[in-house]
A protein has these predicted regions:
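Conserved AMP-binding loop of ANL adenylate-forming enzymes
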Residues: 56-94, 103
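Short hydrophobic/aromatic-rich motifs at helix boundaries and adjacent loops
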Residues: 23-25, 86-89, 139-140, 259
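Short linear functional motifs in flexible/disordered or boundary regions
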Residues: 39-40, 63, 80, 140, ...
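Active-site glycine/GP-rich loop and adjacent strand/helix microenvironment
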Residues: 95-267
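Short, acidic Gly/Pro/Ser/Thr-rich loop/turn segments
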Residues: 34, 76-78, 230-233
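Nucleotide 5′-phosphate-binding alpha/beta core
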Residues: 1-26, 31-67, 74, 122-129, ...
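Short secondary-structure boundary/capping segments
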Residues: 42, 85-86, 198
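Short, solvent-exposed polar/charged micro-motifs at secondary-structure junctions
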Residues: 2, 79, 190-192
Length: 267
């Protein structure tokens, strides 16, 4: 933690460092330079619990306590950043298994697909959080290699990058379980959650979102976020680097939530 800006540390943060009651990670660097993040230990558990309030299925299931698997880039996945090839045991952090160990899913060979399928069946995650592109490649290769893989989790979330309608339809044709979109970032947490009715809602607990018109468009916006969720590193007017397609709306969703903006996608 020597590289963390000492002048920004409050006494509360210094005490957390002394007691090792903190966790540190880096952003993946997909939209900007990698940033070091410091937050209270097990911060994501509370984040899952907050997010579940925007989807009745997740609320009933208490997914923050579920065993979870993550399939996304191997460079950096939330709490895990690997420079070498880690073992199965080394990729289990708390109740989460990180599945991918290669930088490019297009280079996955049959042995890679067999390993991923075997580890999922061995770990038995109730919830799988995936990059939709990675999952679609995995499903294609399972079919191409004729691998017998029957495991079905209780829920799948699609995050990390934009999921097109065709990819969503393809995934749903192969996996029969509740599937929903999530949008967020390592530094902020979850910002948008798809409800059980298929509508994206702002997860507005301790967070405020501002949409700035993008290149004079009336339907495209730059996403600016202010978040107080992480007491060690609050973000004010943070430029996410992502673009939102949205229209004004004050309609009440069938799930009971009312979102002032109809957000169609984020990328």
């Amino acid at each position: 933690m020597k590289s963390f800006p000492n002048k920004w540390m409050s006494n509360k943060i210094k005490e957390a460092f002394m007691c090792e009651n903190y966790e540190s990670t880096y952003t993946s660097g997909s939209t900007s330079e990698r940033m070091q993040i410091v937050r209270p230990k097990d911060w994501w558990k509370g984040e899952y619990k907050r997010t579940a309030n925007y989807n009745k299925y997740l609320m009933q299931k208490e997914i923050n306590n579920w065993k979870k698997a993550i399939l996304t880039t191997a460079i950096c996945s939330n709490m895990a950043c690997y420079l070498e090839t880690p073992s199965y045991e080394e990729r289990i952090i708390h109740n989460t298994l990180f599945l991918n160990i290669h930088p490019d899913p297009n280079t996955w060979k049959k042995t890679d697909i067999e390993r991923i399928c075997y580890e999922i069946e061995l770990f038995k995650p109730l919830y799988i959080d995936v990059d939709p592109i990675y999952l679609s490649i995995l499903l294609n290769k399972i079919s191409d290699y004729g691998i017998n893989f029957q495991y079905t989790p209780q829920a799948i979330s699609l995050s990390y990058e934009y999921c097109t309608k065709n990819i969503r339809k393809f995934i749903e044709s192969h996996i029969k379980c509740p599937i929903f979109n999530l949008y967020g970032s390592t530094e902020i947490g979850y910002i948008l959650c798809e409800c059980e009715c298929g509508q994206m809602h702002l997860c507005d607990d301790l967070i405020q979102v501002e949409l700035i018109p993008f290149k004079n468009r009336t339907d495209l916006f730059s996403l600016i976020v202010t978040s107080l969720r992480n007491p060690f590193m609050p973000f004010v007017n943070y430029k996410t680097g992502d673009i939102v397609k949205a229209t004004s709306s004050n309609n009440k969703c069938e799930c009971g939530l009312r979102t002032p903006t109809n957000i169609q996608w984020v990328m």
